């Protein structure tokens, strides 16, 4: 059976393939091979650049261009050839090394230095840099732009709904009012913090041999400062150098990276659930699309499927990421292979998140505020004014203020008349009575509408 979006086992490459297609060039087997091939080529070029020390003097500029073309022109036919070599070697990096050696054999001058391909390297020297660059590209080209889009969309919602009063619910029960804009601002601020953190996370790489000590390098060329060469090579990719490792780069930065992503995802799950709840309360309506169907049997249904889809995929993403957070920083002694299969699922974890990000944006785009329902719910809950009344009573030294309001309001149907009658009975200045009577569930919103003007 040919592999298509219909025959793929994973919905990442099946049902949701249109949402994850940009990740294929990065996290597919083809992508992984190309990243690793590039590192092998760049390492060979680095060796060539040390020609005066290593006595390599016959490599011309055209050969350097040829090496670059091997990466630039890398295609599926090349990838299949590497996989066929791997069937014999049962070792992916060795297969890649043999492929590159076969390629450079086309050049007489490069053929003379073919044994400098993969010189001094352990497989992890190549793999760890590849993963670093894959994560960097995914972050800079896909994840952060989507986060920015979500955050920017929330910011627009903040000011669009700045003056829409909202009955707050603590423990699911009526509480001091806010505004819809302020409640969205809470999520905006939380997500923006994670955006800034993710952008600044240092992505690390290493190239220092089998156990991190340049043993083979120094055996061949003891007078060369391989530590400095390692640093120069790693930083040339725009990533940070880890000078102290075992055979593997310890993956702490991946744990940091996914900790940030997982927290952003968790905040977004919180947002999805709140939006789901507001839709359920009829605070938001969803724009309908004529040809869409909400239920196979209930024709009237318009379900919040985008927020539900987003929540579900974020859960899957976090499950994988949280496993990686606790698994990847641990390796037995100088290394064990249990991280290898886990690392190959980095793209899967990110893919579920990307699906979720697109879903939440789709859901937000369908929302329409239902102001009448917001006001209707507020009007049913005049008892929330017990908070400002008892607070002002305390200001004027009235004893048992809290207890008196508790007796008046708790578990009872309270309306405007009941509240105003109670206010009239208070021994406080008439101006304060007037101010209290001007308070309603609709305008008792504190500074909710003002403080959001300070968001950046």
UniProtKB/Swiss-Prot annotation:
Pfam families: ASL_C, Lyase_1
The keyword Transmembrane helix belongs to this UniProt entry's keyword annotation: no
Binding site for N(6)-(1,2-dicarboxyethyl)-AMP: 15-16, 90-92, 122-123, 247, 296, 301-303, 309, 335, 340-344
Keyword list, A-Z: Lyase, Purine biosynthesis
UniProt KW Secreted keyword: no
MF GO annotations: (S)-2-(5-amino-1-(5-phospho-D-ribosyl)imidazole-4-carboxamido) succinate lyase (fumarate-forming) activity; N6-(1,2-dicarboxyethyl)AMP AMP-lyase (fumarate-forming) activity
Extent of the signal sequence: none
Record-linked InterPro entries: Fumarase/histidase_N, Fumarate_lyase_CS, Fumarate_lyase_fam, Fumarate_lyase_N, L-Aspartase-like, Pur_lyase, PurB_bact, PurB_C
EC code(s) of this entry: 4.3.2.2
Biological processes, Gene Ontology terms: 'de novo' AMP biosynthetic process; 'de novo' IMP biosynthetic process
Pathway the protein contributes to: Purine metabolism; AMP biosynthesis via de novo pathway; AMP from IMP: step 2/2; Purine metabolism; IMP biosynthesis via de novo pathway; 5-amino-1-(5-phospho-D-ribosyl)imidazole-4-carboxamide from 5-amino-1-(5-phospho-D-ribosyl)imidazole-4-carboxylate: step 2/2
Active site residues per record: 171 (proton donor/acceptor), 295 (proton donor/acceptor)
Cellular component GO terms, alphabetical: cytosol
Catalytic activity: N(6)-(1,2-dicarboxyethyl)-AMP = fumarate + AMP; (2S)-2-[5-amino-1-(5-phospho-beta-D-ribosyl)imidazole-4-carboxamido]succinate = 5-amino-1-(5-phospho-beta-D-ribosyl)imidazole-4-carboxamide + fumarate
Quaternary structure and partners: Homotetramer. Residues from neighboring subunits contribute catalytic and substrate-binding residues to each active site.
Family from the record: Belongs to the lyase 1 family. Adenylosuccinate lyase subfamily.
Protein name: Adenylosuccinate lyase
Lineage of the species this protein comes from: Bacteria, Pseudomonadati, Pseudomonadota, Gammaproteobacteria, Enterobacterales
Gene designation: purB
């Amino acid at each position: 059976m040919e592999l298509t979006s219909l025959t793929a086992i994973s919905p990442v490459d099946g049902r949701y393939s249109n949402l994850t297609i940009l990740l294929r060039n990065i996290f597919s087997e083809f992508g992984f091979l190309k990243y690793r091939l590039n590192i092998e080529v760049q390492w060979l070029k680095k060796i060539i650049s040390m020609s005066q020390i290593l006595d390599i003097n016959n490599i011309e500029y055209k050969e350097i261009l040829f090496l670059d073309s091997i990466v630039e022109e890398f295609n599926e036919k090349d990838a299949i050839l590497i996989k066929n070599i791997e069937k014999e070697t049962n070792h992916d990096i060795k297969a890649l090394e043999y492929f590159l050696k076969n390629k450079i054999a086309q050049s007489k001058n490069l053929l003379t230095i073919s044994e400098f391909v993969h010189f001094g390297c352990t497989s992890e020297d190549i793999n760890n840099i590849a993963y670093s660059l894959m994560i960097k590209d995914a972050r800079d080209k896909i994840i952060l732009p989507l986060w920015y889009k979500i955050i920017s969309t929330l910011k627009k919602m903040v000011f669009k709904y700045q003056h829409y009063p909202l009955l707050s619910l603590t423990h699911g029960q009526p509480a001091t009012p806010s505004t819809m804009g302020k409640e969205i601002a809470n999520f905006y601020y939380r997500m923006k913090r994670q955006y800034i953190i993710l952008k600044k996370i240092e992505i690390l790489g290493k190239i220092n041999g089998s156990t991190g000590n340049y043993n083979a390098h120094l055996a061949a060329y003891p007078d060369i400062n391989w530590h400095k060469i390692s640093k120069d090579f790693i930083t040339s990719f725009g990533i940070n150098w880890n000078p102290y490792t075992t055979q593997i780069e310890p993956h702490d930065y991946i744990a940091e990276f996914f900790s940030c992503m997982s927290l952003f995802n968790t905040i977004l799950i919180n947002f999805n659930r709140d939006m789901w709840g507001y839709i359920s309360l009829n605070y938001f309506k969803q724009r309908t699309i004529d040809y869409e169907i909400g239920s196979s049997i209930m024709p009237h249904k318009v379900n919040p499927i985008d927020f539900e889809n987003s929540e579900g995929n974020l859960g899957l993403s976090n499950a994988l990421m949280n496993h990686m957070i606790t698994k990847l920083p641990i390796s037995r002694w100088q290394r064990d292979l249990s991280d290898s299969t886990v690392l190959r699922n980095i793209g899967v974890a990110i893919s579920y998140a990307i699906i979720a990000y697109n879903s939440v944006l789709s859901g937000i785009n369908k929302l329409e505020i239902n102001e009448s329902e917001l006001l209707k719910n507020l009007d049913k809950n005049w008892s929330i004014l017990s908070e400002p009344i008892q607070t002002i009573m305390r200001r004027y030294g009235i004893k048992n203020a809290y207890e008196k309001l508790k007796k008046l309001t708790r578990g009872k149907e309270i309306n405007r008349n009941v509240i105003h009658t109670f206010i009239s009975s208070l021994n406080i200045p008439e101006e304060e009575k007037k101010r209290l009577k001007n308070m309603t569930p609709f305008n008792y919103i504190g500074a909710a509408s003002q403080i959001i003007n300070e968001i950046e």
